[in-house]
UniProtKB/Swiss-Prot annotation:
The name this protein goes by in its record: TDP-N-acetylfucosamine:lipid II N-acetylfucosaminyltransferase
Major location (coarse): membrane
Protein function: Catalyzes the synthesis of Und-PP-GlcNAc-ManNAcA-Fuc4NAc (Lipid III), the third lipid-linked intermediate involved in ECA synthesis.
Pfam families: Glyco_transf_56
Organism classification: Bacteria, Pseudomonadati, Pseudomonadota, Gammaproteobacteria, Enterobacterales
Chain's gene name: wecF
E.C. code: 2.4.1.325
């Protein structure tokens, strides 16, 4: 029997760390198909912190892709589970036959599914990638992303699967301890990545609420982002008074980030695709409603779980926000499909499907 190989094809330390720790701590002991990884980027202590995994690191996305293609050609029974935003060379290999459809299973994280970049090289590449995506052996994704993908590729198998957000189920009831009143605090974006469209989001918040709310913008990740942080700060200060705007430029530890989220009353996410599911889960767990772009299909997942959804096109005010908080507080968090530990069983199923052990 050939063991399934997992591929983290882009050097995205935060996401890669979450996936590797999840597999090491939760899946590796239960399945031999959850232990073998090929990772773009440096070790950064992963080997030491994930002793249950067999990790192989590659200095660039291109070098990793070459290694994957070589393995795929050497053994056509070898199957790969590609996690998230990988790389151009892998799509082209699927398109050219270097990797066969039966070898290629993909967990969609969002970015590689949507065509949002306007650069010429992206616009030229998107049609090729779209054809390649129709050749994958199967996909795993959120309900909204599965729906989006199926409209383009109805013949490809799709299974529900959620990114393994680090969550403590014992915190599901913690929000009840806080009384919410006074000036609203609004979280804008889930990181410092430009995909959050921070400036457009700040303008949208100002248009809805004016300079009457506290605005918190976490921008400590990714690193080496100071020029963009300064740009966002300047745009924010043109709208909000200094005491109402908090731009966080330092990377935060998880517990500190969790504490920050729990001080908020509303999350505001303007991006027109599924991303930031980890932050959304942590906000929902704390009874903090989220404002989504109507083009972000994750609203379908939220609606399926009977969670209130606010949209950027809605007329928002404090009364609307407080009512959404009340509705969230009435939801039994233990039953939410994309919360821990409910997302575990679909992962076990995904491993068996990708490994060829389940129909």
């Amino acid at each position: 029997m050939t063991v399934l190989i997992h591929v983290l094809g882009s050097d995205i330390p935060h996401h890669n760390h979450t996936v590797l720790r999840f597999f090491n701590d939760t899946l590796a002991a239960t399945s031999e198909h959850a232990r073998e990884f090929m990772v773009a980027g440096e070790d950064n202590g992963f080997t030491e912190s994930c002793p249950a995994l067999s990790l192989h690191f590659y200095g660039s996305k291109k070098v990793l892709a070459q290694a994957v293609i070589a393995k795929a050609k050497a053994n056509r029974r070898q199957r790969f589970f590609f996690h998230g935003q990988f790389n151009t060379s892998l799509w082209l290999a699927l398109l050219s036959g270097g990797i066969k459809p039966a070898q290629f299973y993909w967990h969609i994280w969002g970015a590689d599914l949507y065509e949002v970049s306007h650069g010429l090289k992206f616009r030229l590449f998107y049609p090729l990638r779209r054809i390649a995506q129709g050749r994958v052996g199967g996909v795993f994704a959120t309900r909204g992303d599965l729906s989006y993908f199926a409209r383009q590729h109805p013949g490809v198998r799709g299974e529900l699967l959620y990114f393994p957000t680090r969550m403590d189920p014992s915190l599901n009831a913690m929000a009840k301890e806080r009384q919410r009143a006074g000036k609203l605090t609004i979280l804008v974006g889930n990181s410092g990545d430009r995909s959050n469209q921070h400036i457009a989001a700040l303008r949208a918040v100002y248009q809805q609420f004016g300079d009457t709310v506290n605005v918190v913008v976490p921008m400590g990740y990714p690193a080496n982002n100071q020029a963009y942080i300064d740009e966002v700060r300047q745009a924010g200060l043109a709208l909000f008074s200094a005491e109402n705007l908090q731009i966080l430029s330092e990377k935060m530890e998880f517990d500190a980030y969790l504490a920050l989220l729990r001080q908020c009353d509303l999350g505001y996410f303007i991006f027109a695709r599924q991303q930031g599911i980890g932050t959304l889960c942590l906000l929902i767990q704390a009874d903090i409603p989220c404002v989504l772009n109507r083009d972000n299909p994750f609203w379908q997942d939220m609606a399926e779980q009977h969670l209130p959804v606010l949209f950027t096109t809605d007329d928002l005010n404090e009364q609307v926000v407080r009512e959404a908080q009340r509705q969230l507080a009435s939801v039994d968090k233990s039953g939410i499909t994309f919360f821990s530990p409910n997302y575990l069983q679909p992962w076990h199923n995904a491993l068996r499907i990708a490994a060829g052990e389940a129909e």
